[in-house]
């Protein structure tokens, strides 16, 4: 506003009118239309005749959508996401391409059957292989840097026979040779204090999960998969023909519904499913730049370099 001889009262009135008008516009923007208020064209394109509905636009949700598209090239697929971005752990995790540190596997073998442990490792490896087929390494900044399992001063080192057993199983089950080895030079390499030993895994690596989510999203758009962001599924009901999905914007109908919310699935299932609380700490730039991915305490703690 340019003052051309106008009084301060006049200026204040003009500013007040402009501010009030802008505020009113913002208020209108914040109030989103309900589904039943959309136009015919909007309902036809975005809400009607969807075969598959997917709750959650994270790694699992978008991967599920892409797998469905591969099997059903012409069916309508829709992903419903409660946030304006994926709000779960997909873009908050550390970005480890991992399948099992040796102390983690030892802990698993002590608490579940041997068959189940190696079945779990097989699923992890299969998932990583599928991911690398679907997304190029440069699209998710994948680095085959390996990983280190760090043993604290008050922890017991692994027996050489146990490390040999892990390598034998990895070779027999998955064709991977010399996966685990002790790294006698880790202290000189990294300068860590408080650790007495480290075991190296030659096949693990790191991923930029932000880039990965972006790559999957672009693939979904190219595959004609629809997204409804800022749409929270509150509950659903089903019959023999379809599933009615209720959101804060109204209800819509799909033939099949996939719940891909992982830790948040307790909102939909009457089970004792509770997500574990996790905390991420981000340091300032370190003088001694550490490259790689690292685990400790049976895989419950882990850290890596970024940037």
Give residue spans per PLM region.
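Glycine-rich FAD pyrophosphate-binding loop
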Residues: 71-92
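Flavin (FAD/FMN) cofactor-binding and adjacent substrate-gating region
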Residues: 103-109, 133-218
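N-terminal Rossmann-like FAD-binding beta1-loop-alpha1 element of flavoenzymes
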Residues: 50-78
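Extreme N-terminal leader/targeting segments of oxidoreductases
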Residues: 5, 10-52, 70-71
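Helical element adjacent to the flavin cofactor pocket in flavoenzyme catalytic cores
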Residues: 198-240, 246-248
